[in-house]
């Protein structure tokens, strides 16, 4: 007979590695864009698990896909393939430029695979001297030692000893800096097509075109980290599809599984040939459970009405933020695209994004931050208008408590 353990927030401090600082409440149930904690308190979710819960909590298509697959087959390893993985890979090639897919378990793993492929391709075709990776300041690409080094935030990568070498960080949206530095030694340029953790910073059209042209000029691969922007988040299935450029390699995760862990690296057949048998791998990557859920997510999110709905919801959010700003004069600007939005605080409110987050939580609203000065919103792509209106009423009360 199993005795149910009493779980309280204090248990976290007793048993967990202290690299997180979670809220005091513990959620126990979610439905749509609402969650409930142990005490029955209800919250509106504008955070979406950091841009993960693209269909909200416990969406029927995801629940059905998972439960159906759970009764069939869970795990094999890549000694064998499986039907959900092959179906999902086919779908991803149909909704993107890609011809080949590598499955992993997270965005960091997908980015690690992308970086290894870029280095491998350059070494095979041009020789070992072509190894430089250019990335951008304030970028974020994951927490493995390689990806956190490529990410342009020293706060995440310092303190762990010698870092992987031949990585250069340049200012985002600075064409002249890239022109001055990129060379035939550069094997790849890695970037987010809209910086997330760095403050919700969109690229200029001129910058994104220049990056592609300079990569072509110097035979460098263009790697798009679409872990946060992908799977419908910007109103396109992948953000690159609205930018007029196509990358050589793309990483995707977060919303791909809608809450079930999965990541993928997408690329061309020509490049994929350089990851031969044994050069890279993953025990869990492409497991049937994750791929069955992700297949259901991709099918749902890629529907034209879902993508159009993202654009409509973006306007609802912008209108709500504009009304709050008229009332409280708190935001300097609203940045982002689709349902990856950042409300940048003005000079009087500098450094208080977390204050807004905490106050919102007390009112029953979950939001995020992107640095000290940006309140970030990454809700479900199918959040209802009623849920949005309720959320903004709570945000109004939260800001009022801080004024």
From Swiss-Prot:
It catalyses: N(2)-acetyl-L-ornithine + 2-oxoglutarate = N-acetyl-L-glutamate 5-semialdehyde + L-glutamate. Its EC number is 2.6.1.11. PROSITE patterns: AA_TRANSFER_CLASS_3 (PS00600). The keyword Amino-acid biosynthesis applies. Pathway: Amino-acid biosynthesis; L-arginine biosynthesis; N(2)-acetyl-L-ornithine from L-glutamate: step 4/4. N(2)-acetyl-L-ornithine binds at residues 143, 282. GO terms for biological process: L-arginine biosynthetic process. The keyword Isomerase does not apply. One of its GO terms (molecular function) is identical protein binding. GO terms for cellular component: cytoplasm. The modification N6-(pyridoxal phosphate)lysine is found at residue 254. It is found in: Cytoplasm. Its cofactor is pyridoxal 5'-phosphate. Binds 1 pyridoxal phosphate per subunit. Keywords: Amino-acid biosynthesis, Aminotransferase, Arginine biosynthesis, Cytoplasm, Pyridoxal phosphate, Transferase. Its main location: cytoplasm. Pyridoxal 5'-phosphate binds at residues 107-108, 140, 225-228, 283. May also have succinyldiaminopimelate aminotransferase activity, thus carrying out the corresponding step in lysine biosynthesis. Belongs to the class-III pyridoxal-phosphate-dependent aminotransferase family. ArgD subfamily. Homodimer. PANTHER family: AMINOTRANSFERASE CLASS III, SUCCINYLORNITHINE TRANSAMINASE. This is Acetylornithine aminotransferase. It comes from Vibrio vulnificus (strain YJ016). The gene is argD.
């Amino acid at each position: 007979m199993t005795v149910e353990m009493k779980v309280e927030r204090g248990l976290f401090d007793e048993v967990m590695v202290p690299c997180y600082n979670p809220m005091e409440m513990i959620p126990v149930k979610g439905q749509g864009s609402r969650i409930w904690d142990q005490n029955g308190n209800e919250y509106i979710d504008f955070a979406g698990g950091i841009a993960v819960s693209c269909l909200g909590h416990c969406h029927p298509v995801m629940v059905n896909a998972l439960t159906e697959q759970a009764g069939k087959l869970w795990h094999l390893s890549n000694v064998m393939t499986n039907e959900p993985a092959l179906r999902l890979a086919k779908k991803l090639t149909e909704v993107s430029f890609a011809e080949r897919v590598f499955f992993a378990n997270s965005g960091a793993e997908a980015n690690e695979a992308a970086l290894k492929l870029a280095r491998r391709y350059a070494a095979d075709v041009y020789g070992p001297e072509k190894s430089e990776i250019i990335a951008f300041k304030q970028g974020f690409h994951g927490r493995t030692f390689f990806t956190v080094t490529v990410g342009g935030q020293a706060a995440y990568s310092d303190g762990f000893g010698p870092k992987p070498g031949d990585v250069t960080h340049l200012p985002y949206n600075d064409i002249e800096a890239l022109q001055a530095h990129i060379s035939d030694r550069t094997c790849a340029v890695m970037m987010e097509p809209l910086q997330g953790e760095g403050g919700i910073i969109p690229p200029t059209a001129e910058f994104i075109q220049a990056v592609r042209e300079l990569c072509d000029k110097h035979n460098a691969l263009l790697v798009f980290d679409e872990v946060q922007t992908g799977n419908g988040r910007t109103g396109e299935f992948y953000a690159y599809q609205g930018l007029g450029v196509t990358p050589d390699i793309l990483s995707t995760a977060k919303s791909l599984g809608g809450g079930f862990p999965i990541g993928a690296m997408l690329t061309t057949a020509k490049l994929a040939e350089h990851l031969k048998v044994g050069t890279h791998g993953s025990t869990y990557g492409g497991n049937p459970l994750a791929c069955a859920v992700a297949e259901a997510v991709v099918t749902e999110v890629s529907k034209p009405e879902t993508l159009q709905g993202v654009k409509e919801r973006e306007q609802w959010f912008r209108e709500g933020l504009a009304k709050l700003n008229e009332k409280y004069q708190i935001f300097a600007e609203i940045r982002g695209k689709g349902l990856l939005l950042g409300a940048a605080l003005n000079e009087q409110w500098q450094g208080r994004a977390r204050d807004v987050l905490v106050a919102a939580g007390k009112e029953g609203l979950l939001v995020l931050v992107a640095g000290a000065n940006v309140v970030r919103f990454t809700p479900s792509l199918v959040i209802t208008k009623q849920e949005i209106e309720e959320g903004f009423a709570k945000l109004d009360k939260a800001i009022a408590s801080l004024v």
